[in-house]
Amino acid sequence: MGGCTSKPSTSSGRPNPFAPGNDYPQIDDFAPDHPGKSPIPTPSAAKASPFFPFYTPSPARHRRNKSRDVGGGGESKSLTSTPLRQLRRAFHPPSPAKHIRAALRRRKGKKEAALSGVTQLTTEVPQREEEEEVGLDKRFGFSKEFHSRVELGEEIGRGHFGYTCSAKFKKGELKGQVVAVKIIPKSKMTTAIAIEDVRREVKILQALSGHKNLVQFYDAFEDNANVYIAMELCEGGELLDRILARGGKYSENDAKPVIIQILNVVAFCHFQGVVHRDLKPENFLYTSKEENSQLKAIDFGLSDFVRPDERLNDIVGSAYYVAPEVLHRSYTTEADVWSIGVIAYILLCGSRPFWARTESGIFRAVLKADPSFDEPPWPFLSSDAKDFVKRLLFKDPRRRMSASQALMHPWIRAYNTDMNIPFDILIFRQMKAYLRSSSLRKAALRALSKTLIKDEILYLKTQFSLLAPNKDGLITMDTIRMALASNATEAMKESRIPEFLALLNGLQYRGMDFEEFCAAAINVHQHESLDCWEQSIRHAYELFDKNGNRAIVIEELASELGVGPSIPVHSVLHDWIRHTDGKLSFFGFVKLLHGVSVRASGKTTR
């Protein structure tokens, strides 16, 4: 059982309608679940056109940029985003490399055209200034000594709502330090949300700065016109540029260190309660031109704080990297892991896993299509590499690996066995559900935990040790608090993770050993994705039948599950109970493992 991998896709034998080499009809009729905020067609998407976006600034640019797209006065969710890049090609490419190179060659000219206001987009869609909300306070409390302390250099980058320049500190502790300064005009901050976005970006950078794979934050300044964010200057270029230099393809051993660095910083962010929400190759920079230079995550303009039991609902990010649950407006940190899966797919094969001619078509592909693992080079890559990418790209976020788990996947672990694995904050969500579960479900989870495979046990042992068990080998509320406090940043306080710990009050007066921790932390949906699930669940039921099963009437079962009085329990739960002896049936056992009682839910959405 130690060799279990994830189940192959049930549709792997079918042709992927969005895979390279197929014909692509124009798809404009897709909309997310909330049609009131569905994407607004752009002029280039309204008819057949040789233009299609390769990297779009956001899957919801109608929300973030209405003034540009439809002349409206919509709110801007982000002040920094990647400019729209359009590529002049009519047919679906097998690899992004060739025409991205063409786009890069044209980038300078397009920037100049954008600055002069003569791009195709601006000539077809007149722009209007967004109306500013009344009574906005644009004071941030940052230092106002920017011009006396910093000497600005040339512009090195530009987004929709700001631009970046090289600069040098003229005095103070950082005298002589060359930095990058992100400049955000206050005239662009036309809503309270936009102002809060800037404030939150600075908070996140300040709190998380210091991680080796995250851009170093130095200081924030403001004057009457702008906000200035001084950060580390990374001179090695974007990860995207390195991908292009290799012709859009990495070997497995070359891809691993890139993916490890991305996973490291994302796992750290998630541990601190921060979700990035815009992970893509453009948002990772190398510190120098050297081949083995460090990779740094940048652009936290769309990032947010999130608790383990909290879900976000605003659509942000970049179309090719956006997770299905983001389009459904209910997501958490797993959405970042999906984006890493897309990056890993591109690194290993040079193509995007989801493609269409229009933004709405991309969204449909993300929601409905399965990425192809049949075309070269996938048949020639290792089974571990394919399993790794597939487990990052499960459409059901409950089955998807976390960033910490991905660092312990056999494909990664075989490359580097001496990594510091961050604590997986989502384990607290599993523990909360376990502690609030009925005694019957706890017994079922304990039985299932006896069937864990070697890789799962190794991962849980690592996570258990990070919670600093006491001399008796038990974790308690005190050991958990101390373990978190030793690694906490201000971001963890902002995301209210310490408050969430109060929900683990079942550990207030007792400890939890490793055996019970396995039952509490096991992810049933992830375990189900393994190809040994059928064998595992049958064996677990046998153990449960011997040690935990008992006679139970339907009304008691309904009460334990938290089923309300409006539910016809006899018809719903009839098959859950074995008619011969009144004990839980195999069907009921499986359902009980998957089901979470009303008492164990209580997740919040914002």
Swiss-Prot record:
Q: Where is the composition biased (Basic residues)?
A: 98-110
Q: What's a Gene Ontology MF term here?
A: metal ion binding
Main enzyme class: transferase
Modification note: Autophosphorylated.
Residues of the Protein kinase domain = 150-412
Membrane topology qualifier: Lipid-anchor
Cite the positions of N-myristoyl glycine lipidation: G2
Instruction: State where Ca(2+) 2 binds.
Output: E516
Q: Say which family it is in.
A: Belongs to the protein kinase superfamily. Ser/Thr protein kinase family. CDPK subfamily.
Name of the protein in its database record: CDPK-related kinase 8
Species in which this protein is naturally found: Arabidopsis thaliana (Mouse-ear cress)
Quick one: which gene encodes this?
CRK8
